């Protein structure tokens, strides 16, 4: 499915649903959307945000003619504790059989990702990512870093909920950052974004600033579209160096 998410081109949800695991989950957009779809009697969401397979879309990537960047499971966590290998294996088979696409796997449970890829090869056309919203979750980055492969490894700091100036980006190929959206959005001070950006510059890691979200650079709450995505007057939309060759 085409998407407006700035750092990808399509979303694919052969599995959806999740449970809260950390601070970033507090205002989960996917949970709200899943409940809305359930209320609209969409068959695949009849159980709401419960971790569920959606076999109806499993073969979707075969029909995409244009090579695409694909965010896998935007409506949940592919490596949730309740997702067994018997669900993951068919997803990986589709990925391997569609090498024209690049698949972005983003999880808040990188230990499960690490364990899975100890048992199975990492497809060449995947990027592996984890969410890290503040310094309390640096261990997720360590788990991601420990996965033995040459694939792009990336971090999503959205919503950014704490200063991360001292982040270790050794072995990390890309950092995404953004503020929270929605009526209950928590404000991210400009200093936190600057600190993360400057850390990326020190580590020579491409930095992608997605959005301010509901709170602007000036600390005023307004539409995320009005707040835009300029940090200190500049757009930061850097990509992993390999992306130039895709």
Segments (PLM) and residue ranges:
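Charge-rich, low-complexity amphipathic helices
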Residues: 40, 47, 117-118, 222
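Auxiliary Fe-S-binding modules of radical SAM enzymes
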Residues: 1-16, 20, 37-40, 161, ...
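Conserved AdoMet/S-adenosylmethionine-binding subsite of the radical SAM
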Residues: 53-208, 215
């Amino acid at each position: 499915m085409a998407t407006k998410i700035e750092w990808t081109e399509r979303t694919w949800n052969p599995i959806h649903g999740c449970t809260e695991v950390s601070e970033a989950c507090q205002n989960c957009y996917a949970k709200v959307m899943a409940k809305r779809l359930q209320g609209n009697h969409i068959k695949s969401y009849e159980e709401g945000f419960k971790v569920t397979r959606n076999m109806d879309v499993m073969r979707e990537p075969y029909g995409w003619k244009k090579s695409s960047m694909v965010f896998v499971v935007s409506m949940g966590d592919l490596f949730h504790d309740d997702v067994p290998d018997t669900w993951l294996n068919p997803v990986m088979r589709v990925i391997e059989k569609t090498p024209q696409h690049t698949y972005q796997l983003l999880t808040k449970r990188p230990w499960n990702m690490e364990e899975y890829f100890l048992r199975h090869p990492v497809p060449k056309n995947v990027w592996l990512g984890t969410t890290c919203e503040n310094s309390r979750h640096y261990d997720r980055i360590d788990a991601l870093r420990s996965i033995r492969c040459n694939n792009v490894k990336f971090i999503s700091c959205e919503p950014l909920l704490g200063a991360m100036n001292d982040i270790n980006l050794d072995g990390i190929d890309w950092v995404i950052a953004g503020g929270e959206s929605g009526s209950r959005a928590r404000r991210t001070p400009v200093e936190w974004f600057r600190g993360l950006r400057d850390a990326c510059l020190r580590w020579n890691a491409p930095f992608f600033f997605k959005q301010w979200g509901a709170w602007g650079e000036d600390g005023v709450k307004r539409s995320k579209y009005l707040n835009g995505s300029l940090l200190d007057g500049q757009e930061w939309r850097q990509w992993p160096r390999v992306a130039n060759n895709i």
